[in-house]
């Protein structure tokens, strides 16, 4: 009887522990909130999202965070080996905030769409009619043309570093080459990356010693050692990570990418374009300025698009300028015309190339009808520093058709064509491309007028 009495008292004591005034926060809730706050700080440090209402990732983060706040306000009560959650006074407001945020977010997504803002999407780019013979300098010698594509640059760049045992054992050449104008000459530049987390930990105090510079005209690559080591890199971790460093310096900015460039003295800088929306809250994002980061010192400086230094080449990304042209070509006649009528609708082809002219880097791409045939109705060129855009009404074969035609001429050799460059031969728009073997070595080149078949030539 005595033992049974003690058991009943023990059970009663357990009920008293969990029995607290309903609707109030208890010790479990306080612990949950502390864990949540710590988790939020860890997430922000790891992901470093932009704290900006024009960022969809920021909205997702906020909705999840408020939902977790609501979860932390629940009161978990134990009754007869059953665990039940009971809402407190703070749970319902948190739930309503989540519902309202989701509803507002969906409304803003709809209000930012092409359906309601077609004219704003179409007006992001100003297209001028260009004169091909005047705008594009005439090419007189093949050996003065930059014909190297990125895959070939990677091969040559890795060879330049491969002979340096102390470098190649700790670092690897980035596959992201930037096409730049370096003191009047077209160049491709790539950073060195840490070859994994362990290599970063072993070398973080020494930093990255240099970068790779590739000459696409001479087919040469050089490893350039910097006076000061590169401390901030996309391949670094913790506080040395370039993205984290720049985003935390400008927490409200929405960054579009990070591109390595060189100033006139050969010093490396990362160009970080900043985006803002022009249609509703989320739509029609375009570059409003750039943050220039010195990766050796960590110093950063913001410039509006109109105030960017002349040595900077990549304010706009090639994908972005082509996207803006597509919006212009498809939505100038209104949204419903782009869906059903397609009257006057046009868009860029699937890829683009780079052309260095007058100290700037331009993107060129074919323009075709939305009906999707294998011919171009013209081509467009966009300046990646100023955003200036020109359209040339020159009909002919689209780039991939020219590549396929060139490969057909040497199909017995099995060579593959690179994406063509656009040149001016006696006032005639002409594609020129290299033909490579299975090992990626350049064997021949092919010339193709926009409206004729290609003529392959041996590189010798």
Where is each model-derived feature located?
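Membrane-interface segments at or immediately adjacent to transmembrane helices
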Residues: 115-189
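Exposed beta-strand-loop-beta-strand "reactive/processing" segments of non-cytosolic proteins
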Residues: 168-204, 257-291, 349-381, 418-445
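Membrane-embedded alpha-helical segments of integral membrane proteins
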Residues: 33-81
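Single conserved hydrophobic/aromatic residue that forms the stacking wall/gate
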Residues: 451-460
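Surface-exposed loop/turn elements that mediate protein-protein interactions on large endomembrane-trafficking
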Residues: 381-391
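Long alpha-helical, hydrophobic tracts
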Residues: 228-364, 370-376
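Membrane-anchoring hydrophobic segments
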Residues: 1-47
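Internal/C-terminal transmembrane anchor helices
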Residues: 89-114
């Amino acid at each position: 009887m005595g033992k049974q009495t003690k058991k009943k008292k023990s059970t009663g004591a357990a009920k008293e522990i969990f029995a607290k005034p309903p609707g109030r926060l208890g010790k479990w809730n306080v612990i949950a909130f502390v864990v949540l706050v710590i988790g939020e700080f860890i997430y922000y440090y790891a992901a470093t999202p932009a704290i900006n209402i024009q960022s969809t990732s920021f909205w997702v983060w906020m909705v999840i965070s408020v939902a977790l706040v609501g979860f932390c306000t629940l009161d978990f009560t134990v009754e007869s080996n059953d665990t039940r959650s009971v809402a407190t006074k703070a749970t319902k407001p948190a739930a309503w905030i989540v519902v309202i945020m989701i509803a507002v977010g969906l409304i803003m997504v709809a209000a930012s769409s092409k359906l309601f803002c077609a004219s704003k999407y179409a007006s992001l780019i100003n297209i001028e009619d260009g004169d091909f013979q005047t705008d594009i300098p005439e090419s007189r010698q093949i050996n003065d043309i930059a014909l190297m594509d990125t895959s070939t640059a990677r091969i040559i760049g890795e060879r330049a570093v491969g002979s340096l045992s102390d470098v190649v054992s700790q670092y690897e050449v980035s596959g992201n080459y930037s096409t730049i104008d370096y003191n009047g000459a077209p160049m491709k530049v790539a950073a060195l990356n840490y070859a994994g987390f362990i290599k970063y930990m072993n070398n973080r105090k020494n930093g990255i010693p240099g970068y790779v510079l590739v000459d696409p005209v001479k087919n040469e690559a050089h490893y350039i050692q910097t006076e000061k080591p590169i401390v901030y890199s996309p391949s670094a971790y913790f506080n040395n990570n370039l993205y984290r460093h720049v985003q935390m310096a400008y927490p409200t900015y929405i960054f579009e990418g990070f591109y390595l460039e060189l100033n006139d003295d050969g010093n490396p800088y990362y160009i970080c374009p900043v985006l803002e929306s022009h249609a509703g809250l989320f739509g029609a994002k375009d570059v409003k300025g750039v943050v220039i980061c010195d990766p050796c010192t960590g110093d950063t400086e913001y410039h509006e698009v109109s105030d960017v230094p002349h040595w900077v080449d990549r304010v706009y990304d090639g994908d972005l300028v082509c996207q803006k042209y597509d919006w212009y070509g498809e939505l100038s006649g209104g949204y419903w015309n782009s869906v059903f009528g397609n009257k006057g609708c046009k868009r860029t082809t699937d890829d683009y190339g780079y052309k260095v002219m007058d100290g700037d880097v331009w993107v060129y791409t074919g323009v075709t009808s939305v009906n999707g045939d294998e011919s171009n109705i013209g081509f467009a060129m966009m300046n990646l520093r100023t955003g200036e855009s020109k359209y040339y009404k020159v009909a002919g074969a689209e780039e991939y058709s020219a590549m396929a035609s060139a490969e057909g001429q040497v199909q017995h050799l099995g060579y593959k064509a690179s994406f063509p460059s656009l040149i001016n031969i006696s006032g005639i728009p002409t594609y020129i491309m290299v033909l490579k073997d299975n090992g990626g070595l350049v064997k021949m080149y092919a010339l193709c007028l926009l409206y004729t078949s290609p003529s392959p030539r041996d590189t010798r």
